[in-house]
Amino acid sequence: MLEIKDLAVQYGNQIPTIEHFDLSMKKGEIISIVGESGSGKTTVIRAVLGALPGAGRVASGDILFHGKSLLKNSQSDWRKLRGSKISMIFQDCGGTLNPIRKIGSQYVEYICTHEPMAKKEAWQKAVSMLSKMRLPDAENIMNSYPHQ
């Protein structure tokens, strides 16, 4: 399903921050990338998601998802893939929500970015997803701010 072959990631003309990284992941597997702060965990995942910041680039190697190289993806390809087929869960995921916007509006925006649907339908889908996670009172969560 996901195969990373001899990955090297570089920022600008500096020496690569990641070198010779390999990973093979089969369907149904859950993998955690663990390491010290600054060891390149986030850089590897950002490379897999095509989301390296600034001058970051894959200098060598390949990243295959279902046998297709992700390095050839267009921005449109990435939009279709991210969040629906492949995603990242941050260690401190609470920091990814805007603290001055309600959770529901952010969740709906995210769903609509990845799936063409009306906001009302996206809201219902979000409530359903929260309920499936057995979170109490999904509607209340959607109407709350991240800090509540």
PLM ranges: what are they?
Residues 92, 99-113, 125:
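Q-loop/switch helix immediately C-terminal to the Walker
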